[in-house]
């Protein structure tokens, strides 16, 4: 039988017509002489009705069918006696005249329904079953819709879709590369790209002018949160473009995706916020602007405080900053606040000072030190009776990171965030360099090919401090999540050489690693820039999904393992031999 339409697309317009549908048994109810089956396919569910008196053969097929069996059924569409408002086909059903079991199924490892009681690893092991759950299939359909819009948008704006290599040279961009040994050249290795960054710059040197690609990227980094070792980005580059042109291009794409894929109109242009303001007010370079509770500096008000933690911090050139939790005095106990204090110690905070605002003044561990300054503090902070005020003292990043975390975690706990909002924001004027505590050195805040602000080029000269420089870079933020970023690129080989030097590369090391780019810069590289969107994270936010893994068909788990195929796995000795590799067994941990 040839399928006439998707089960989930069967409609009232087909009442009285004969249709053929095929799909999985989502539910089966045997009422004696009648059997009802909910047949599912990617478009939804339709109810099949099998009547023993009307068609014995079809009824017997339904009698043998079980959950997740695959059926094909031919029958007449008719109106349902009782409408089911929970499904799109709830006004009709199919009276089956002929049916056949196309495939049987073992008992599923978990219920194939949206509210599933199963571990994530079990779901990933049977991902092909997990994806039959309606919301999971809807995530894939949304992702497909977004990528379709992306292709159409860039095609209509004169961009060329150009593929770049996935086997290339190792040029680490902050994270570790995944390396691939060469059989032909023993001891030599390819690397999987962390991004198409260098190749898209070379495409601009080639005269492509406007490039885009939906690209796979790979980073061998320690997993945290929702990060994946392989991920997908919407990559773009434009020659002879100013930052405003690139941002307008991105806003046009976002506006169209929001309208066509999500049904939401977002106003453009998006707000712009300088990196410094984002850090000062939100404690984050990806601020969530859906709620207030802004960070405020009170260093000048407490510099002479009898509370030595505050006064000594300010005397050392550091900061005392605070947030006000509206109505928090009754909502957070001393025990609750201590838990918050313990958490922010991971950011380097020495402690968390707090007071509750009462009619009589401040109440709390440091109240006796601050009551003399209460009026000035309350005026600065707009604190009212019943509020909780949290203070952190320390260096710029300690204070920002700690209060940024407190701001976001408390907003979630107090339900201060409107989850239906989509607040897009540009964060601009980033520092060119940042100090990485893990690596113990200065690194590029975005990447080493980012062009500095024209006024800051002087900081690359001998005797100047390059770490004061700011870059022509910009991130696009949605609801406190970075979903993309970009910059104007360096097109002058002399400037590029100075940036490499500021990052600690010798001339020889820079030539060995990036010689091909330097050569391109010396052979007619146009002024250019671009950006990239993280497709996985963007779709996750549009779908209101719980995890980035929900919007990827076959993701890795939080340990970078794919339970379905048990990757990564071992290979046999013959494969290692032809690659001229030996594997040394890692020593066991001491017990």
Curated annotation (Swiss-Prot):
<feature type="binding site">
    <location>
        <position position="482"/>
    </location>
    <ligand>
        <name>ATP</name>
    </ligand>
</feature>
<dbReference type="InterPro" id="IPR029351">
    <property type="entry name" value="GAD_dom"/>
</dbReference>
<dbReference type="InterPro" id="IPR047089">
    <property type="entry name" value="Asp-tRNA-ligase_1_N"/>
</dbReference>
<dbReference type="Pfam" id="PF02938">
    <property type="entry name" value="GAD"/>
</dbReference>
<keyword id="KW-0436">Ligase</keyword>
<dbReference type="GO" id="GO:0005524">
    <property type="term" value="F:ATP binding"/>
</dbReference>
<feature type="binding site">
    <location>
        <begin position="534"/>
        <end position="537"/>
    </location>
    <ligand>
        <name>ATP</name>
    </ligand>
</feature>
<dbReference type="GO" id="GO:0006422">
    <property type="term" value="P:aspartyl-tRNA aminoacylation"/>
</dbReference>
<keyword id="KW-0963">Cytoplasm</keyword>
<keyword id="KW-0067">ATP-binding</keyword>
<dbReference type="GO" id="GO:0005737">
    <property type="term" value="C:cytoplasm"/>
</dbReference>
<dbReference type="GO" id="GO:0004815">
    <property type="term" value="F:aspartate-tRNA ligase activity"/>
</dbReference>
<dbReference type="InterPro" id="IPR012340">
    <property type="entry name" value="NA-bd_OB-fold"/>
</dbReference>
<keyword id="KW-0547">Nucleotide-binding</keyword>
<dbReference type="Pfam" id="PF00152">
    <property type="entry name" value="tRNA-synt_2"/>
</dbReference>
<dbReference type="GO" id="GO:0003676">
    <property type="term" value="F:nucleic acid binding"/>
</dbReference>
<dbReference type="InterPro" id="IPR006195">
    <property type="entry name" value="aa-tRNA-synth_II"/>
</dbReference>
<feature type="binding site">
    <location>
        <position position="446"/>
    </location>
    <ligand>
        <name>L-aspartate</name>
    </ligand>
</feature>
<comment type="function">
    <text>Catalyzes the attachment of L-aspartate to tRNA(Asp) in a two-step reaction: L-aspartate is first activated by ATP to form Asp-AMP and then transferred to the acceptor end of tRNA(Asp).</text>
</comment>
<dbReference type="InterPro" id="IPR004365">
    <property type="entry name" value="NA-bd_OB_tRNA"/>
</dbReference>
<dbReference type="GO" id="GO:0140096">
    <property type="term" value="F:catalytic activity, acting on a protein"/>
</dbReference>
<feature type="binding site">
    <location>
        <begin position="219"/>
        <end position="221"/>
    </location>
    <ligand>
        <name>ATP</name>
    </ligand>
</feature>
<dbReference type="GO" id="GO:0016740">
    <property type="term" value="F:transferase activity"/>
</dbReference>
<feature type="region of interest" description="Aspartate">
    <location>
        <begin position="197"/>
        <end position="200"/>
    </location>
</feature>
<dbReference type="InterPro" id="IPR004524">
    <property type="entry name" value="Asp-tRNA-ligase_1"/>
</dbReference>
<dbReference type="InterPro" id="IPR004115">
    <property type="entry name" value="GAD-like_sf"/>
</dbReference>
<comment type="similarity">
    <text>Belongs to the class-II aminoacyl-tRNA synthetase family. Type 1 subfamily.</text>
</comment>
<protein>
    <recommendedName>
        <fullName>Aspartate--tRNA ligase</fullName>
        <ecNumber>6.1.1.12</ecNumber>
    </recommendedName>
</protein>
<dbReference type="InterPro" id="IPR002312">
    <property type="entry name" value="Asp/Asn-tRNA-synth_IIb"/>
</dbReference>
<keyword id="KW-0030">Aminoacyl-tRNA synthetase</keyword>
<feature type="binding site">
    <location>
        <position position="228"/>
    </location>
    <ligand>
        <name>ATP</name>
    </ligand>
</feature>
<feature type="binding site">
    <location>
        <position position="489"/>
    </location>
    <ligand>
        <name>L-aspartate</name>
    </ligand>
</feature>
<dbReference type="Pfam" id="PF01336">
    <property type="entry name" value="tRNA_anti-codon"/>
</dbReference>
<keyword id="KW-0648">Protein biosynthesis</keyword>
<feature type="binding site">
    <location>
        <position position="219"/>
    </location>
    <ligand>
        <name>L-aspartate</name>
    </ligand>
</feature>
<dbReference type="InterPro" id="IPR004364">
    <property type="entry name" value="Aa-tRNA-synt_II"/>
</dbReference>
<dbReference type="InterPro" id="IPR047090">
    <property type="entry name" value="AspRS_core"/>
</dbReference>
<comment type="subunit">
    <text>Homodimer.</text>
</comment>
<feature type="binding site">
    <location>
        <position position="173"/>
    </location>
    <ligand>
        <name>L-aspartate</name>
    </ligand>
</feature>
<dbReference type="InterPro" id="IPR045864">
    <property type="entry name" value="aa-tRNA-synth_II/BPL/LPL"/>
</dbReference>
